[in-house]
Amino acid sequence: MTKIMFFGTRDYEKEMALNWGKKNNVEVTTSKELLSSATVDQLKDYDGVTTMQFGKLENDVYPKLESYGIKQIAQRTAGFDMYDLDLAKKHNIVISNVPSYSPETIAEYSVSIALQLVRRFPDIERRVQAHDFTWQAEIMSKPVKNMTVAIIGTGRIGAATAKIYAGFGATITAYDAYPNKDLDFLTYKDSVKEAIKDADIISLHVPANKESYHLFDKAMFDHVKKGAILVNAARGAVINTPDLIAAVNDGTLLGAAIDTYENEAAYFTNDWTNKDIDDKTLLELIEHERILVTPHIAFFSDEAVQNLVEGGLNAALSVINTGTCETRLN
């Protein structure tokens, strides 16, 4: 019987993974550990592996997988910047991802958390907790229909986000290297700077790559409309975090919401209750009154989890049986 290791198992995924195994006549072993130099030897007797990595995979894992006859790693996220695709290819390892598992879920997150900032909910909540129930100009908002929203990246998630904002009646600008002709309700601009210059809300939906690394830094924030709101449900490396904090502090941004953080791997998805966090930048984000932080959870719905579990396992089995899969990256 084919054997697949399901690394990075969350409690809510285990039953889904085992049920998939029964349906597909595959022996699935679940483990809460991640694939790493320390765990790769567990795969000696396995045919395939799926995992949910957040940090970089060590280089010595690839040749070990090759020596064990394993031909793939199925990543259970859309992001794949934790892998060295060229090194994997050198060792005959197919890397795959799950590019679309519930774009609507992430789009709903992006819009809902932006609306919290639009309606000044963090400020209002602090006032109410202090028993201040007055109406002040500082907590007055304006309708989204009177706003311009910039969508940076109009793939599945960005497109879904744009459609929600269109339902509010917002004016929508966008930038993508490959414009989507079906999104005829928005206006594409020739650059990110052009797309954001009049935007009240900026919503990021781009992958992590050389072109997007620290795309939003001080130089980019200099082109932002004063008082704009920034939402990042894409990848942490898209933003230069100290520059983001500075932009909020000096009023360039009214506020920001981030679901991803460049150095999140050691913290996000782990319980740090009653433990000391050494990352001063992360602490500054968390403690900032005008920055909302969530732990890479924009995708987190029952539909998305089911699709990620099955997407990873289906890709692993496809490579085992055929040598390739529809979602291969290298």
Swiss-Prot record:
Coiled-coil residue spans: none
Catalytic activity as recorded in UniProt: (R)-lactate + NAD(+) = pyruvate + NADH + H(+)
Active site per UniProt: 235, 264, 296
InterPro entries per UniProt: D-isomer_2_OHA_DH_cat_dom (IPR006139), D-isomer_DH_CS (IPR029753), D-isomer_DH_CS1 (IPR029752), D-isomer_DH_NAD-bd (IPR006140), NAD(P)-bd_dom_sf (IPR036291)
Record: residues binding NAD(+): 156-157, 176, 206-207, 233-235, 259
Keywords: NAD, Oxidoreductase
EC class: oxidoreductase
Entry EC number(s): 1.1.1.28
Molecular function (Gene Ontology), one example: NAD binding
Gene3D superfamilies: NAD(P)-binding Rossmann-like Domain
PANTHER family the UniProt entry points to: 2-HYDROXYACID DEHYDROGENASE HOMOLOG 1-RELATED
Family of the protein in this entry: Belongs to the D-isomer specific 2-hydroxyacid dehydrogenase family.
Descriptive protein name: D-lactate dehydrogenase
Organism annotation: Staphylococcus aureus
